Amino acid sequence: MDEKTIKKSILSSSNDEKIIYKSRIKKFQKNHKFYIILLVFIAILQFISIAFFTRGFLLSRHVLDNISSQNETSKLPPRFNKAVILVIDALRFDFAIPVNESHSNYNLNYHNNILSLYDSFASDKDASSLLLKFIADPPTTTLQRLKGLTTGSLPTFIDAGSNFDGTVIEEDNFLKQLHLANKTVKFAGDDTWMALFHPFLSNDSFPLESLNVWDLDTVDNGVMDYFHDHLQQDKEWDVMIGHMLGIDHVGHKYGPDHFTMREKQIQVDQFIDWILKSIDDDTLLVILGDHGMDHTGNHGGDSIDELESTLFLYSKKPDMWRLKETSNYNIDNLGHDYRSVRQIDLVSSLALLMGQPIPFNNLGWPIDEIARNDREWSQFVNSAISQLQLYKDTMQIHHGNDEILEPLAKNISNTPPTSDPEKFVKLGHKYQKVFLQTCEELWAKFDYYSIATGITLLATSLVLLISITKLIPSIVVNQMVPEFVPGIIIMVLVTNLCFHGIFYVYQQPSFVDQFWGTLLATAIGIIIGCYITIFDRYNFIWIAMRLGETLADYWSRIAVMFMIIHALLFTSNSFTIWEDRIVAFLLSTFGMLTLYEFVFLPKRQSTTALLTATISEKEGTTSGVNPSTANSNYLPLTRFARLLGGYHSAVLIIFTRLASMITICREEQGEYCIPTFNNQNNSSWWVLGLCFLMIFILPACITGYYNLTSSYQAAAPIWINVFLKGILGLNFVYWSLTSLENNSAVIAIPFLRDVTIFKFTLARIIAGFSLIASNVGWLMGPLCIKLNIHNTDVKSHEATILGYTNIYGSEFFLLVINVLISILLFNKPLAQLSYFLMCNQLLSILEIIDLLKLKENIIGPIALGLLSYQHFFTTGHQATIPSVQWDIGFMLSEKVTFPFTQIAIILNTFGPHILVSLSVALLTLWSQPPDVLKPQTLLGRIVSNCGILLTYNTILCLSSFIWVTHFRRHLMVWKIFCPRFIFASLSLIVTQLVVTFGTIAFASGRLIKHINDIFWK
């Protein structure tokens, strides 16, 4: 008898056992499919609730398609027949004025490099130049700024989400007016203009890819070449527009404090100087920034640095502007007291200067300095007031401010512009300010029906999740799953039939159309279908008593306390902005409590797992636990187990603290937060050195955890010591090349000047292997076990299966490694160090949960949930728009390419949530041999732990819904509470998708069946 025969005989079973197994596995496969369908229905219910709430809360203003005409606004002769408009993206105001080198905030890289504008203004003796501070209205994303600059209207928060999906602006705007007047508008630069205005632009325009922030020169060089070719030689244009992106892209890629910013600003300054000399006397030159940038180079929020940009008007004709007193243009202290105008004021100003009607939806006010005398100024004001009053009358706007507006309008009509121009101007400006405030308040109206529907549906889904995944025993849910699915399908059909029948017979409610009615009917059908099945077996009293029993033990109460504390953070803006610190504190608290448990309370016997085991032994196998293992759960921890548990607790505490040192700060945190996650540190050699060490340390750490259960066998060495180490090495090469690009000392080396092609190739190789090849290998690869024959006599059957006690967990974690290496590619070096710490924290939590017999306790999923939120913050993110790392989207392609750009940004932003959503199954599978739990019981417990993680994220999402609604009139609602609710919604969606389709549908079902096929258990 050879060794192969011995192995086969050890794993063989009788025919009766095989028949029983086949019946069991067939039932398992059937229930597995039903579980997936049930979770999909619950996910649909939650997605519908999020959709309703988002519809009701995220505002969108009503836009009229009216177009202004010269008959509606007073006809004024044009002062200029041609205009050159140059938009310099992210031209912060202090970039364009002289800054004293002794100033505390002076920086060589971004100050005193663009002096053409101020020099022209300061040396101007004949009033041909005008330089102003230009204040943007948040959000400061480029698309929203272009809308404001061309229509004169205010953006809403929901517009920020369309920055990458611009569609043609149908409302009246400055470019449409030029088009209607048969003016030729030529354009070069940011292709966002083509997305928004292509019907109004010349076919000779030259749009360029705008979203690739890694490319600093292509757009700028294209604009400069286009202007050199067309500005003087080509006479067939009336307005020429250029939009340069280099300064903005340098900010996104490196931050403002980088030598490349100085180079780019000098290039822009030279180009401006050339334009000043090249335009003719009849051309108006407008140079402006659409927004600024913060200290990290980002924008999108409403900090001062993000809102303050630059506006420069110039003509070679003298006496074009009527300047105010010199004190209004004080550049001291970075221009803190310098005169400013709002961006919405530009539209009416340009329209009046070019002799065009003011766009219909404009809410701005002409810039004071554009009028050369009082008479002309009163004419401008008269045109502006006529347009505003026409807009108000057409919109039929009524508000509490009418008692102010109506007397003002009457006084204006009774005050002829020619007789008392000063009074007329004052009345007109006051009218505009009050009307603008009125529109801002009116556009802040919420759809309370949709908000209430969203909150109600999400709260109901929370109750369903808790009932199905925790209150009802998993072994009973196994029996009920085949009843849930048909019940839900039938009720969804019935409710849709009823809803649409009612809508057909009776008038449809005003707050819900046919599409939203279908969604609501579907949600109600899912709820009714679930509750019919539940209450067919149980009642409210039993469920309430079961809830009390579940929360009776120590660790469950700790878990609930953590959830409540986290959910209550959203009750205050002060708590919300410090969420990163609070989450780290809660995770450290869990580590301290487990350390106390191992050191001082080794004989604790009151965990839910022990009680379940006891019940299983006394009452049979109701919970699915093998009775032979029940007594082992009663045994106190051995000395070695206590030492091991103490070690893992210490690792969790220390690594949580180390991870919290990687910070990206919110503006509201002020001086109390020192950012460490920045471009300088991510490109530093010490961080790259740590990443190099991680190539060897991370595989060694994972190997150590595997050796605890003798699981470092077969597939494990290949995955951990070859694949993981190899990908980490390639990853290190990629980010080292990126660091070289940031280093002025080495960038001059010829062969290092352009490594873009090599980086793209390397990134695609890593992504292809980690996203596709490694997962195919996992599906087809061997288990992490080895048959060890003790006796040299091959006729002896004495053998040990190494890795048997952790056969599920060791194999499943290889899939986690696949996902980890996928995520690491799309994260910057400091974030990769955070993931190294996270991996060790994750494995320590799994060991702690196993040692304390807490596999069925809710503390496990909650601890993993806290881990995901901590590392969301430590990988360079906050719940704000500016913290989204858009530049990562261009690691695989030079332009926005579906789906590669989206995959990169999702893996970068939600990597920790994806890892935890996949790893939550390990709470059940880690150190779980095949002979303890039946396949169905094992799957039921995995679903239970996944359900608790979903419950945690649902509670956070529900809390954010409630409190963002409560604070809807709060000063910080759009800056703090609204972004947090969006992040909570997206986190829940990502968790639902990964848990349902990744953890349950793909990984767990396949692994359980595969292992049971081998061992016939």
Swiss-Prot record:
Record-listed E.C. numbers: 2.-.-.-
Topology in the lipid bilayer: Multi-pass membrane protein
Pathway entry: Glycolipid biosynthesis; glycosylphosphatidylinositol-anchor biosynthesis
Pfam family, one: Phosphodiest
Consequence recorded when altering T901A: In MCP1-4; impairs growth at 36 degrees Celsius
Glycosylation sites: N66, N71, N100, N182, N203, N411, N681, N682, N707, N742
One GO biological process term: cell wall organization
Gene Ontology cellular-component terms listed: endoplasmic reticulum; endoplasmic reticulum membrane
Post-translational modification: Glycosylated.
GO molecular-function terms, A-Z: mannose-ethanolamine phosphotransferase activity; transferase activity, transferring phosphorus-containing groups
Compartment list: Endoplasmic reticulum membrane
Effect seen on changing D887G: In MCP1-4; impairs growth at 36 degrees Celsius
Reported effect, I367T: In MCP1-4; impairs growth at 36 degrees Celsius
Family label: Belongs to the PIGG/PIGN/PIGO family. PIGO subfamily.
Function: Involved in glycosylphosphatidylinositol-anchor biosynthesis. Transfers ethanolamine phosphate to the GPI third mannose which links the GPI-anchor to the C-terminus of the proteins by an amide bond. Involved in cell wall biosynthesis.
Extra facts: Present with 300 molecules/cell in log phase SD medium.
Designated name of the protein: GPI ethanolamine phosphate transferase 3
Gene giving rise to this polypeptide: GPI13
